[in-house]
């Protein structure tokens, strides 16, 4: 299995976690919702895979480029 890191594309605050590690996600599946500049931005997986790591919690601040999660793809 190949490990792919998910990075934050914009700075903001984690508003809501949608899934926990161990969950199988489809391509473009939402991992969490980021609040930035009064907008809610879904953070999604680029490919289908299993969420193996989640490095953020609700309320956490993230910066652009932070590694926020990792998925395993076949």
Question: What kind of region is each of these model predictions?
Answer:
Residues 1-13, 33-46, 73:
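Short beta-strand-turn/beta-hairpin segments enriched in glycine/proline and small hydrophobics
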Residues 8, 17, 32, 54, ...:
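Preference for bulky hydrophobic residues occupying beta-strand positions
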Residues 10, 20, 47, 57:
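Short, ordered coil/turn segments that flank beta-strands lining enzyme active or ligand-binding pockets
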Residues 16-20, 24, 53-56:
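Short histidine-centered loop motifs in beta-beta connectors
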Residues 22-31, 59-68:
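A structural signal for short beta-strand/turn segments enriched in small hydrophobics and glycine
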Residues 49-61:
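Short, highly charge-biased, low-complexity peptide segments
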Residues 65, 73-74:
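Helix-adjacent hinge/juxtasegments
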């Amino acid at each position: 299995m190949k490990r792919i890191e998910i990075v934050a594309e914009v700075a903001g605050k984690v508003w809501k976690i949608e899934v926990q590690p161990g969950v199988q996600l489809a391509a473009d599946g939402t991992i969490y919702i980021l609040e930035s500049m009064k907008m809610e931005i879904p953070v999604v997986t680029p490919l289908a895979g299993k969420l193996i790591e989640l490095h953020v919690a609700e309320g956490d601040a993230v910066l652009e480029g932070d590694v926020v999660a990792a998925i395993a793809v076949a």
